[in-house]
Amino acid sequence: MIYKILLINFFLVFSSYSNDIHDSFENFVVGATLNLNELNTQKSNLFLKDFTYLTPANAAKQTIVHPKPNTWNWAKINKMLDFANLHNLDLRIHGPIGPQSSKWIKDDIRTSDELMLNLVEFMTESCIKFSKEPSVKWMDVVNETILSSGKWHGPKPGNNKWENPWLKIGLDENEFPIYILKSFEIATKLAPNISLVFNQNAGFQPRLWDKLKKSVKYIRSKGYRVDGIGWQGHLLLSKSTYGFVNDLDKGIKDLSNLIDWAHENDLDFHVTELDYFVEDKSNLNNDLLDQKMIYSRIINLLKDKSKNGIVTLNFWDMGERFKKGKGYFQSIYSKELEPNPSYELLNNILK
């Protein structure tokens, strides 16, 4: 009889423990990015082995879908949607209004009316289309709108620079960008079943994130939804993220505080484009060990914060990505698609 009681108690304790484990992970969603040319390849097979959360790279951006008047091209994102539906994946659409815009939009002769018309057309058709897709769970509405200085990201001369031409549309009576309000207005109205994300690059410069926090509250004050905020996490790509890596304890604390603020304000938190940049590969083995250590700190934090609200993590690409004139972006697999040291960290969050 005593044996039976002990056995029952053990079962109850074990069941409770198992449920706690399950509950602690159900708010933490982990995935990766694939490009169109990577579908039905070894890389996509590796993706399907571990993930069900996909970001379809840049296939949904304005520069591809609606680069200029009377020009539309849904072919790339349609193929990504087909892939997601075939494999029962959840998608975050990365087609935000921001710097990754067509040359036509960036041309200096563009008027504010022309920019607004293209924005309204693109956002309207995108929201109508993706709201009908059961695989689409999240959508980046705007991206890279604030500089690390805290100033609004705006236009530059020419059409071949990293710039944000949409600011030319103007500011409202409270000095807030009209294009941001219009983007969230359209998404709120036409994508009611998609979680709307305000995505942002750089590190944890206080002026930047203070402005983003005020922006979220201002957008909501107009009656529009903001359901989540995103931090890209392109580590060591620019000076704006050097501080996160060079003073990791402070960087993790800053990230922790931002996630807490998000959850306290009924926002999901997304790490949207995590990778690790190295300028050359002369010391790659050590660089990859550093990457693993930094990723471990980030992932452990995200796991812990998922107890308080939804947290997602997206690895930008699966393998090494080379950018001419820049260097090498490292992810969880090597150029040859062999697991990098960072891949080992997935054992604790995917199993």
Predicted regions and their residues:
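Boundary/entry segment of secreted carbohydrate-active catalytic domains
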Residues: 19-53, 57
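Aromatic/hydrophobic pocket-lining residues that form the small-molecule binding cavity
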Residues: 47, 73, 77, 115-123, ...
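Substrate-binding cleft and catalytic face of glycoside hydrolase catalytic domains
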Residues: 49-67, 76-203, 267, 276-281, ...
